[in-house]
């Protein structure tokens, strides 16, 4: 550690700036998993469309907004995948069954690295359409009293 501080000072003299993670901001990585057979689905995280369409199984890897990889990502990827932030976040899910008589089950799950259970879990079989909006808090480490947001429709 004694060598790291002077080395950082030398790098900063040449214009290097520490990343958000190096400066102490936690790094968040999550997986958004959607089993949307028989449904059209739209998922937004903090107002950003995650690019989920439904009709199949889809997964998205999500990161915090100031993740160091965000700088290298194409703007469209950055807008869909680098959407998480420390503290309060919002997830919105809109869905419609493509065939109201279908017995397909929709499942939308947001799993955060280091958390014991999904942060958010939606399961719907009975409703032909719906819109759910929930808020969740991200912090590292996961709170001891963490409870998953579970919606069954």
Ranges and model annotations:
Residues 1-4:
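Positively charged n-region of N-terminal signal peptides that target proteins for export
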Residues 6-15:
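Bacterial N-terminal signal peptides
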Residues 15-16, 63-64, 104:
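Alpha-helix boundary/interfacial micro-motifs
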Residues 18-58, 74-153:
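Beta-strand-rich recognition domains
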Residues 63-77:
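Aromatic sugar-binding surface patches on proteins
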């Amino acid at each position: 550690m004694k060598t790291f501080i002077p080395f950082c000072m030398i790098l900063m003299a040449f214009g290097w700036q520490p990343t958000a993670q190096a400066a102490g901001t936690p790094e968040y990585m999550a997986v958004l998993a959607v089993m949307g057979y028989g449904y059209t689905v739209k998922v937004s995280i903090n107002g950003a469309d995650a690019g989920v369409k439904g009709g199949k199984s889809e997964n998205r890897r999500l990161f915090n907004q100031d993740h160091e990889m965000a700088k290298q990502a194409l703007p469209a990827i950055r807008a869909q995948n680098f959407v998480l932030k420390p503290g309060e976040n919002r997830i919105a899910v809109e869905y419609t069954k493509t065939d109201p008589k279908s017995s397909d089950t929709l499942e939308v799950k947001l799993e955060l690295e280091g958390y014991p259970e999904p942060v958010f879990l939606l399961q719907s079989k009975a409703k032909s359409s719906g819109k759910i909006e929930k808020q969740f808090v991200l912090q590292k480490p996961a709170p001891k009293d963490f409870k998953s947001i579970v919606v069954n429709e």
